[in-house]
Amino acid sequence: MRVFAALLMLLVSAQDDEMKKRDAFTREFKDKAPAKRVEAVGKMHGSVEDKSIVAVARGLTDPAPEVKKATAACLETCTDSGGSAVKPLCAILTNKKEDKDLRLACAKALAKEEYKAEATDAMIQAITIDEKEKELYAFGAEVTKILGAFAGQDFGATKETPAKWQNWYKLNQAMLAKADAEKLAAWKKSAGKGK
């Protein structure tokens, strides 16, 4: 019984610490200086609460590229049990107008996600590179490695690789989406969000 009480106290303390950290982040992230916002994001590394993930993910829309990169790097260290960062990370990864390093940081963060369907689709879109976009080949090769490890598949790194991934995704999309929906429902139930 003492062990249970000690564990409960530890859990409550950790939640309280993250809430304080999140409150400080919310205040500090309003600073006009990008360096201060980067610093605020850095303090959120390792966050696990959904409210924290949602707050940090907003940094992906910051006008300063260094803040976006810091946000993606931070999200890579977080436990996003509710999948709250998936959509904003995918949006940047698939946007060819965004900086390649930022897009790669988003791919790395997505590779840590528990939710596979949307993240896999975004990575496949990111590696689908037109012949006129030769400057993206190295980026595409890096994302292909990340995608392979994330999905547990290897289709090499050739011109045919995106088509192979697209075919694989068509065959597995429903299964991935179903697994994601089940994970989300279980998370909502455990977090008291699904009634």
Residue ranges and their predicted role:
Residues 27-35, 60-66, 94-101, 128-138, ...:
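Short coil turns that connect the paired helices of HEAT/ARM alpha-solenoid repeats
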